[in-house]
């Protein structure tokens, strides 16, 4: 549909909890398509509605081989005590990376574009992306969850050793 402009990191929409979707209609379908188009144009792994100035709990995640995950009003039902610490970043904060500890496995409840409830169990990288994007829709940037922010040299070393 359309590639949307990203809001800057200082935009107030990114500090507030996004509103729940109550109407599952064509405007939601357009928003999901706009998120997809914008995500791919930005070469991002995921994108949520507040990042394109829409205060709605709607997000999209590129799970590569598993396809595209659409999240509408997602809620974490359970998560493992076992955690993994890994590098995270955001297109909202370019060139900022941090080590974030997150649950290794989660169960998330969400809705599809038609308003049907779906439940998904996610592990490792996909679980991390879902937790990251839900935080973002709740006004919590990954930097608030980061154990530490990395220097440019540390980020380079991460990618060389990966």
UniProtKB/Swiss-Prot annotation:
GO molecular function terms attached to this record: peptide deformylase activity
NCBIfam families for the chain: pept_deformyl (TIGR00079), PRK14595.1 (NF011189)
One matching Pfam family: Pep_deformylase
One GO term (biological process): co-translational protein modification
Coiled coil: none
Similarity comment text for this entry: Belongs to the polypeptide deformylase family.
Top-level division of the source organism's lineage: Bacteria
Source species: Staphylococcus aureus (strain MSSA476)
SUPFAM superfamilies per UniProt: Peptide deformylase (SSF56420)
CDD domains: Pep_deformylase
Record-given protein name: Peptide deformylase-like
């Amino acid at each position: 549909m359309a590639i949307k402009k990203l809001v800057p990191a200082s935009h107030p929409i990114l500090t507030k909890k996004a509103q729940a979707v109550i109407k599952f209609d064509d405007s939601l379908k357009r928003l999901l398509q706009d998120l997809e188009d914008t995500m791919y144009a930005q070469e991002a792994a995921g994108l949520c509605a507040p990042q394109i100035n829409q205060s709605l709990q709607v997000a999209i995640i590129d799970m590569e081989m598993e396809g595209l995950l659409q999240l509408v009003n997602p809620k974490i039902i359970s998560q493992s005590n076992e955690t993994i610490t890994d590098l995270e970043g955001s297109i909202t904060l370019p060139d900022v990376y941090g080590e974030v500890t997150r649950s290794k496995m989660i169960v998330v409840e969400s809705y599809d574009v038609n308003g049907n409830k779906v439940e998904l169990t996610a592990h490792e990288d996909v679980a991390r992306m879902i937790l990251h994007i839900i935080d973002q829709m709740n006004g919590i940037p990954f930097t608030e969850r980061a154990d530490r922010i990395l220097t440019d040299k540390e980020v380079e070393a991460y990618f060389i050793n990966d």
